[in-house]
């Protein structure tokens, strides 16, 4: 395993469902979907936490984290306390718990140390789920290569060469990431009649209204774009909400005889400021994550998702629609 940057991982605790559990879930499926849409992450089944971390003793916190560890799931773990993603001291109690788990699990102390993240609060990068990940490093046929200490110099015909060693490999699985949230759109040469491109508009970072439209680019409607919950929610729920909202907008446009939909510049400015304000009230900006574009050299460092929660975002979008699509400019002739 060639590791550049350690990330936190918690157990998935996947398990087979009994026939009774499966039947009950299918019977109540619609209720589960409706519940999910009322939650911040778009994922139901996780009661929101009622306590702040400092309200528990160290022993009680350890018991709480232990219970979440054995329950499994990243949402469940981050729901141990109300302030894990907003208070650095609270977050550090969760970090310390997971680091202790790594020490207890991985027999080689040096390898264990390499696997312990020390550069970001837990949950501010996508929290990984695993089945026996840390236990894997106790196997005789598994080696961890710390490429910060021994960087990769080249790929060879038979494997990978680092500054110090050569590794013969049958297969290489890349986990190097991608240009999230804006990369696919900016790969398309989207231009308006005056010649300005979307690349020009977003040169200092993406700017949208609700993550759905960007001022000056009429009739360009974006699905789960920057400025919306997008990757910080259940993507199915996020996509469906956007598609439904755009469908209703199109019906409104057609009924009114409009030809063009655009974002009001002032509404966009206020939304961008709101997205940044919400992000700054959390610990997310403290991580060099792909949420900020940190994995792409030269990409502007802008926190792209809206992290107030899918539930709050849906309410905002519904309110915009109920008020004649406030913040949008509708025209009966294309400019």
What do these predicted ranges mean?
Residues 1-335:
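N-terminal FAD-binding dinucleotide-binding subdomain shared by FAD-dependent oxidases/monooxygenases
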């Amino acid at each position: 395993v060639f590791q550049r940057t350690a990330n936190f991982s918690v157990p998935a605790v996947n398990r087979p469902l009994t026939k009774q559990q499966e039947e009950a879930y299918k019977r109540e499926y619609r209720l589960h979907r409706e519940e999910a849409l009322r939650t911040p992450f778009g994922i139901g089944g996780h009661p929101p936490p009622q306590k702040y971390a400092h309200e528990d003793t160290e022993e009680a916190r350890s018991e709480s984290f232990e219970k979440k560890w054995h329950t499994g799931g990243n949402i469940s773990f981050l729901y141990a306390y109300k302030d894990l993603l907003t208070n650095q001291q609270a977050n550090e109690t969760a970090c310390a718990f997971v680091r202790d788990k790594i020490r207890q699990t991985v027999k080689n102390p040096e390898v264990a140390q390499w696997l312990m993240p020390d550069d970001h609060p837990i949950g501010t990068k996508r929290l990984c789920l695993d089945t026996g990940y840390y236990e894997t490093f106790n196997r005789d046929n598994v080696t961890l290569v710390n490429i910060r200490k021994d960087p990769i110099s080249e790929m060879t015909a038979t494997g990978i060469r680092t500054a110090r060693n050569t590794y013969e490999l049958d297969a290489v699985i890349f986990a190097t990431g991608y240009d999230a949230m804006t990369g696919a759109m900016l790969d398309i040469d989207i231009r308006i009649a005056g010649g300005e491109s979307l690349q020009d508009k977003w040169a200092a970072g993406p700017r949208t209204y609700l993550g759905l439209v960007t001022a000056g680019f009429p009739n360009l409607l974006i699905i789960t774009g920057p400025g919306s919950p997008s990757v910080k929610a259940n993507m199915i729920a996020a996509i469906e909400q956007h598609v439904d909202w755009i469908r209703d907008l199109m019906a409104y446009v057609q009924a009114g005889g409009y030809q063009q939909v655009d974002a009001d510049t002032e509404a966009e400015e206020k939304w961008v400021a709101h997205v940044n304000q919400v992000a700054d009230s959390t610990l997310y900006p403290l991580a060099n994550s792909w949420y900020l574009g940190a994995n792409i050299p030269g990409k502007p460092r802008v926190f792209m998702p809206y992290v107030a929660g899918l539930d709050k975002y849906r309410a905002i979008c519904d309110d915009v629609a109920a008020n004649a699509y406030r913040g949008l400019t509708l025209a009966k002739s294309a400019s």
